[in-house]
């Protein structure tokens, strides 16, 4: 008897690919055959996928890149990808197709609809991406990593959470050491490529803190390569113990040891912080077209687990005030930690697996 076959469509950014990777690993353990459908850009992120996953590069494109001629070619490239994917699906008849967003998912999701294969989406952010919004009403379920998520009327939204790495799950609910008269860890990061505004504002905010607090802080801050030296110099002027680098290794350990986290509110970052259970100050990316990072932070902020600080309000003075407020109120900080755990979904991968298995029916869904 042949193995059940899952096609995962994802690409564009690590935000789409990492949860797709988590699902692929879980389905392989369940004995499924797994195929990843992505484009050349998404293929840069496949290094973490198991060698047992078949990688298929499809023809796709985005209207957000390139000049006028490149944009004119986009529909033709996508159409070619859809034709190829449709022909393959007619031959293979996959049991389930799951899209994780991004333009590279268009060929597989369109082909799944045309051939009537069971299909669903996973949306990482609190606002549907462009491609997921197109397909949301034409799939069985929209699995939502962030809750609530803004979905079109008629779409079946289900809260599954965002899958997190096994190393994060292992640190889930690690005992929180509240701030006090002992060394305190402050973790600062800005996503996959850092955030210049955090490099500008955080060191200046730390300089405004009372010396008694500064003397207790141990700071690890991610920064862009071009910002590392100046950020380090700013802390050196304060004679502080800091680690500034373009990439912070062993994030699960760093999260579990932190008294406070300051970061962007990307979907995966929020999920990781909630699962470990740490107080956070979120600075959403202001240029995000759909303001999805503000939506991502809504759950923990409403629960009392985090403080939302839009870029328009982020100054050394406002940030210093917020940091001091959290680090001088240990009981309140502990409650923030507990609140983060209350909105965490450590079993997000298992929830996705359950949906896939439910969809794996012998008859195709209606189109």
UniProtKB/Swiss-Prot annotation:
The keyword Nucleus does not apply. Its EC number is 2.4.1.227. Pathway: Cell wall biogenesis; peptidoglycan biosynthesis. It catalyses: di-trans,octa-cis-undecaprenyl diphospho-N-acetyl-alpha-D-muramoyl-L-alanyl-D-glutamyl-meso-2,6-diaminopimeloyl-D-alanyl-D-alanine + UDP-N-acetyl-alpha-D-glucosamine = di-trans,octa-cis-undecaprenyl diphospho-[N-acetyl-alpha-D-glucosaminyl-(1->4)]-N-acetyl-alpha-D-muramoyl-L-alanyl-D-glutamyl-meso-2,6-diaminopimeloyl-D-alanyl-D-alanine + UDP + H(+). GO terms for cellular component: plasma membrane. It is found in: Cell inner membrane. Disulfide bonds: none annotated. InterPro entries: GlcNAc_MurG (IPR006009), Glyco_trans_28_C (IPR007235), GlycoTrans_28_N (IPR004276). Its main location: membrane. Pfam families: Glyco_tran_28_C, Glyco_transf_28. GO terms for biological process: carbohydrate metabolic process; cell division; cell wall organization; lipid glycosylation; peptidoglycan biosynthetic process; regulation of cell shape. Keywords: Cell cycle, Cell division, Cell inner membrane, Cell membrane, Cell shape, Cell wall biogenesis/degradation, Glycosyltransferase, Membrane, Peptidoglycan synthesis, Transferase. UDP-N-acetyl-alpha-D-glucosamine binds at residues 13-15, 125, 165, 192, 293. HAMAP family: MurG (MF_00033). Belongs to the glycosyltransferase 28 family. MurG subfamily. Cell wall formation. Catalyzes the transfer of a GlcNAc subunit on undecaprenyl-pyrophosphoryl-MurNAc-pentapeptide (lipid intermediate I) to form undecaprenyl-pyrophosphoryl-MurNAc-(pentapeptide)GlcNAc (lipid intermediate II). This is UDP-N-acetylglucosamine--N-acetylmuramyl-(pentapeptide) pyrophosphoryl-undecaprenol N-acetylglucosamine transferase. It comes from Jannaschia sp. (strain CCS1).
């Amino acid at each position: 008897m042949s193995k059940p076959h899952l096609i995962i469509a994802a690409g564009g950014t690590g935000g789409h690919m990492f949860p797709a990777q988590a699902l692929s690993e879980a389905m392989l353990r369940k004995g499924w055959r797994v195929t990843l459908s992505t484009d050349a850009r998404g293929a840069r992120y496949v290094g973490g996928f198991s060698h047992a996953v078949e990688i298929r590069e499809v023809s796709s494109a985005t209207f957000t890149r390139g000049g006028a001629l490149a944009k004119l070619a986009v529909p033709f490239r996508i159409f070619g990808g859809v034709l190829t994917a449709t022909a393959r699906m007619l031959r293979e008849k996959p049991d389930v197709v799951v899209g994780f967003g991004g333009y590279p998912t268009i060929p597989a999701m369109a082909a799944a609809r045309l051939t009537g294969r069971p299909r669903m989406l996973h949306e990482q952010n609190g606002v549907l991406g462009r491609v997921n919004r197109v397909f949301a009403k034409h799939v069985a379920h929209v699995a939502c990593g962030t809750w609530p998520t803004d979905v079109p009327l008629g779409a079946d939204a289900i809260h599954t959470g965002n899958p997190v790495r096994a190393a994060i799950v292992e640190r889930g609910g690690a005992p929180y050491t509240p701030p006090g008269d002992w060394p305190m860890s402050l973790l600062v990061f800005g996503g996959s490529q850092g955030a210049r505004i955090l490099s500008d504002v955080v060191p200046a905010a730390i300089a405004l803190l009372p010396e008694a607090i500064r003397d207790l802080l141990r700071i690890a801050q991610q920064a862009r390569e071009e910002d590392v030296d100046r950020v380090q110099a700013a802390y050196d002027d304060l004679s502080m113990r800091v680690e500034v680098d373009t990439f912070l290794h062993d994030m699960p350990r760093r999260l579990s040891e932190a008294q406070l986290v300051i970061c962007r509110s990307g979907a995966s970052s929020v999920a990781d912080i909630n699962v470990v259970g740490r107080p956070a100050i979120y600075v959403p990316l202001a240029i995000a077209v759909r303001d999805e990072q503000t939506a991502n932070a809504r759950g923990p902020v409403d629960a009392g687990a985090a403080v939302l600080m839009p870029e328009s309000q982020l100054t050394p003075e406002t940030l210093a005030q917020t940091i001091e407020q959290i680090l001088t109120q240990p009981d309140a900080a502990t409650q923030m930690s507990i609140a983060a755990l209350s909105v965490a979904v450590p079993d997000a991968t298992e929830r996705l697996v359950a949906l896939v298995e439910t969809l794996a029916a012998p008859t195709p869904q209606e189109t």
